[in-house]
């Protein structure tokens, strides 16, 4: 049975790279009717925080990536926090010590640093000198009993190669003489990342480890641990890195990089999932838009690229604009409540159909939910500021007097619909031998304070006759010299 896992460290928000890894695991599990497990790798006790674990889970759920086993729902192979599994790890570390496949290392940090410095001076890569490798277990235990601190190192093979069979990259060879007798238990009593990964993946019956390319260098060490414990390793697949447009490492200076930030910036979960799918994988046929259900059907690890994916926020924003136009208006209404409330606008106070009509208009010209708010505040608040350039260009006495002369006709217009309003405005322009655009732009500034809005006549229909007349009258009173 296919069993995959996403194992984030709770040291910050869910990064776009982590979200992509979680998504690929989720797709693979769903495609093969398998299980998707969430495991929290909180072995870094200094940096790990429970609130970050909760934030990561919240972001995954928001994206629609649900797990079958995990910290919050439990499962057959828990606990799902690594910090709660130390007894299991110690059992296997003791097994390796007893079998002579690992050993206690009493070298202090100062001694290790000295060795590093010598290697640096000799211009060779550092490898531990192995001076504790032949200390007997009995002697080591006696020294520990007498108060000495010790780490535990694995006895790694000293020649030959370790081969990683990678579904995406093929066979990747690592020379064993470069691998060193690496530490599996630190002197403070905490097991290391590579060791706990192996034990947990085995115990949780993980069939495929799908993770980021930066973990590829950890894989030979993990294979050595599997071999020492006589355990069968899972299959590995290392997905490509995500780089910034300049091919540097993606970081804060490139803008939003966490799922939480994308949410706050008004991106839709459907758009983010769609975009993440394209970072290293393609549905084929030169397509950009693909939903989760279709992706599950088409996803294959063998078709994931080896090459780094380039993060392009403009492409994400374009995709977001597509989904924003397609989303059901009821759904959009619900999602917009949060973003309007951040601006102090409670849309529940307004007639729901009125709000939905405003949203239908505005969403055609914007790309994010934040932009929806910014482009529509005048529908819900008539205390808007007037754009200064718009005032200077359009709110001239001549233009305002023309608009003012339209008021009686607007008041009597039935139905107060976009086609009827447009017909009235254009007839007025023709009768006065003025450009219709002048009247249109003047009314726009009068009723919104802006020079750029959705179509004026549709906007007037949504605002309604009473509100339009009130705003025009107020603007004329403010800017016409009495």
Curated annotation (Swiss-Prot):
Concerning Gene3D superfamilies, the annotation shows: 1.10.10.350, Glutamate-tRNA synthetase, class I, anticodon-binding domain 1, HUPs
A GO molecular function assigned to this protein is: tRNA binding
Question: Which GO annotations describe the biological process of this protein?
Answer: glutamyl-tRNA aminoacylation
> Where is the motif 'HIGH' region annotated in this sequence?
8-18
Q: Its catalytic activity?
A: tRNA(Glu) + L-glutamate + ATP = L-glutamyl-tRNA(Glu) + AMP + diphosphate
Identify the EC number(s): 6.1.1.17
Q: Which domain of life is it from?
A: Bacteria
Q: Does the keyword Electron transport apply?
A: no
Placement of sequence motif 'KMSKS' region = 249-253
Can you cite an annotated GO cellular component?
cytosol
Q: Which UniProt keywords apply?
A: Aminoacyl-tRNA synthetase, ATP-binding, Cytoplasm, Ligase, Nucleotide-binding, Protein biosynthesis
What Pfam family is a match, any one? tRNA-synt_1c
Q: Which cysteines are joined by disulfide bonds?
A: none
User: Mind telling me which SUPFAM superfamilies this protein's record contains?
Assistant: An anticodon-binding domain of class I aminoacyl-tRNA synthetases, Nucleotidylyl transferase
Instruction: Give binding positions for ATP.
Output: 252
InterPro entries in the record: aa-tRNA-synth_I_cd-bd, aa-tRNA-synth_I_codon-bd_sub2, aa-tRNA-synth_I_CS, aa_tRNA-synth_I_cd-bd_sf, Glu-tRNA-ligase_bac/mito, Glu-tRNA-synth_I_codon-bd_sub1, Glu/Gln-tRNA-synth, Glu/Gln-tRNA-synth_Ib_cat-dom
Q: Where in the cell is it found?
A: Cytoplasm
Protein purpose: Catalyzes the attachment of glutamate to tRNA(Glu) in a two-step reaction: glutamate is first activated by ATP to form Glu-AMP and then transferred to the acceptor end of tRNA(Glu).
- Could you tell me which HAMAP family the record lists for this protein? Glu_tRNA_synth_type1 (MF_00022)
Q: Which family does it belong to?
A: Belongs to the class-I aminoacyl-tRNA synthetase family. Glutamate--tRNA ligase type 1 subfamily.
Whom does it interact with, and what assembly results?
Answer: Monomer.
Kindly provide the name given to this protein in its UniProt entry.
Answer: Glutamate--tRNA ligase 2
Species of provenance? Caldicellulosiruptor saccharolyticus (strain ATCC 43494 / DSM 8903 / Tp8T 6331)
Q: Which gene encodes it?
A: gltX2
């Amino acid at each position: 049975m296919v069993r995959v896992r996403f194992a984030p460290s709770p040291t910050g928000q869910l990064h776009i790279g982590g979200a992509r890894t979680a998504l690929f695991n989720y797709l693979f599990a769903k495609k093969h009717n398998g299980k998707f497990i969430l495991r929290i790798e909180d072995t870094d006790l200094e940096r790990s925080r429970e609130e970050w674990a909760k934030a990561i889970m919240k972001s995954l759920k928001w994206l629609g990536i649900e797990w079958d086993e995990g910290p919050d729902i439990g499962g057959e192979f828990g606990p799902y926090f690594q910090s709660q599994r130390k007894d299991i790890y110690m059992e296997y570390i003791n097994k390796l010590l007893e079998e002579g496949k690992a050993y206690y290392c009493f070298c202090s940090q100062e001694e290790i640093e000295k060795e590093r410095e010598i290697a640096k001076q000799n211009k060779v890569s550092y490898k531990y000198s192995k001076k504790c490798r032949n200390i007997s277990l009995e002697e080591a235990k006696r020294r520990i009993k007498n108060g000495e601190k010790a780490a535990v190192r694995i006895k790694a093979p000293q020649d030959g190669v370790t081969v990683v069979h990678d579904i995406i990259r093929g066979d990747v060879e690592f020379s064993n003489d470069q691998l060193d007798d690496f530490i599996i238990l630190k002197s403070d009593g905490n097991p290391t990342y590579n060791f706990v990964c192996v034990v947990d993946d085995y115990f949780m019956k993980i069939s495929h480890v799908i993770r980021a390319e930066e973990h590829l260098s950890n894989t030979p060490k993990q294979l050595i641990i599997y071999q020492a414990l006589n355990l069968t390793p899972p299959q590995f697949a290392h997905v490509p890195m995500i780089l910034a447009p300049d091919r540097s490492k993606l970081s804060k200076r490139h803008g939003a990089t966490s799922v939480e930030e994308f949410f706050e910036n008004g991106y839709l979960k459907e758009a983010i999932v769609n975009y993440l799918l394209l970072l290293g994988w393609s549905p084929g046929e030169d397509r950009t838009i693909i939903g989760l259900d279709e992706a599950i059907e088409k996803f294959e690890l063998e078709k994931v690229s080896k090459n780094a994916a380039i993060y392009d926020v403009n492409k994400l924003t374009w995709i977001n604009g597509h989904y924003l136009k397609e989303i059901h208006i009821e759904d959009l209404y619900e999602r917009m409540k949060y973003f309007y409330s951040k601006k102090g606008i409670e849309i529940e106070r307004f007639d729901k159909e009125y709000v939905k009509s405003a949203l239908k208009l505005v969403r055609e010209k914007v790309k994010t939910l934040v932009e929806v708010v910014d482009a529509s505040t005048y529908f819900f608040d008539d205390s808007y500021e007037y754009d200064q350039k718009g005032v200077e260009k359009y709110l001239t006495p001549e233009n305002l007097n023309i608009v003012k002369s339209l008021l009686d006709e607007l008041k009597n217009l039935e139905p107060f619909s976009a086609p009827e309003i447009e017909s009235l405005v254009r007839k007025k322009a023709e009768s006065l031998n003025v450009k219709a655009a002048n009247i249109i732009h003047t009314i726009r500034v009068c009723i919104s304070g802006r020079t750029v809005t959705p179509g004026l006549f549709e906007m007037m229909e949504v605002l309604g006759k009473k509100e339009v007349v009130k705003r025009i009258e107020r603007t004329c009173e403010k800017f016409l010299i009495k």
